[in-house]
């Protein structure tokens, strides 16, 4: 009669989660009236997981592989909504970076030279601290650059939108000409 609502397939779980579910069921059978807090139970499970043999872990890994195959097969047949990313027009102007990002660009090389073994995350944290401790006077040049970049961006965006509208009008008039209709020029 009506459309059937197709539910999204249940996600696959790891071998450790399969072990957890099995261990939980065994624990409930052995001690049905005992309550164990989540933290304590998790600790027991992780200790047990580390102590079991590779042969036993292989059983759970096989279950996880089967579950993954099931999930992938169900996703192939799933017709529900999937998010599609909007394709970005390469001619569309890009938004200007923030004053903080300009600050990061200026200080990244310096921090990397001073600390060559730092990861990108560590450098980012350091620049974040530098920015938060910087005074308004130190931030002012970056904010001025951002203001200039923003003004330029909005000019380019306005020009881009005008060009897009002109292209749309041209396409519409061309389509109508192909159909033999006359288009009023305004």
UniProtKB/Swiss-Prot annotation:
CDD domains: HMG-box_HMGB_rpt1, HMG-box_HMGB_rpt2. Residues 9-79, 93-161 bind DNA. Residues 77-98 are annotated as: Disordered. It is found in: Nucleus; Chromosome. Gene3D superfamilies: High mobility group box domain. GO terms for cellular component: chromosome; nucleus. SUPFAM superfamilies: HMG-box. GO terms for biological process: regulation of transcription by RNA polymerase II. Its main location: nucleus. It comes from the Eukaryota. Keywords: Chromosome, DNA-binding, Nucleus, Repeat. SMART domains: HMG. Transmembrane segments: none annotated. GO terms for molecular function: DNA binding, bending. Belongs to the HMGB family. PANTHER family: HIGH MOBILITY GROUP PROTEIN B4, HIGH MOBILITY GROUP PROTEIN DSP1. This is High mobility group protein B4. The lineage of its organism: Eukaryota, Metazoa, Chordata, Craniata, Vertebrata. The gene is HMGB4.
């Amino acid at each position: 009669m009506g459309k059937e609502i197709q539910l999204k397939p249940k996600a696959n779980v790891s071998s450790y989660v399969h072990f957890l579910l099995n261990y939980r069921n065994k624990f409930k059978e052995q001690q049905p009236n005992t309550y164990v807090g989540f933290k304590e139970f998790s600790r027991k499970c992780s200790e047990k997981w580390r102590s079991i043999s590779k042969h036993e872990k292989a059983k759970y890994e096989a279950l996880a592989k089967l579950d993954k195959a099931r999930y992938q097969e169900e996703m192939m047949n799933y017709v529900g909504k999937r998010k599609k990313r909007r394709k970005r027009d390469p001619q569309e102007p890009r938004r200007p970076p923030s004053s903080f990002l300009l600050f990061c660009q200026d200080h990244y090389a310096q921090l990397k030279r001073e600390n060559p073994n730092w990861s990108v995350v560590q450098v980012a944290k350091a620049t974040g601290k530098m920015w938060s401790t910087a005074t308004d006077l130190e931030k002012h040049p970056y904010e001025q650059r951002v203001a200039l970049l923003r003004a330029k961006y909005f000019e380019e965006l306005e020009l881009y939108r005008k060009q897009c509208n002109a292209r749309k009008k041209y396409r519409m008039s061309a389509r109508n000409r192909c159909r033999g209709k006359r288009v009023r020029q305004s």
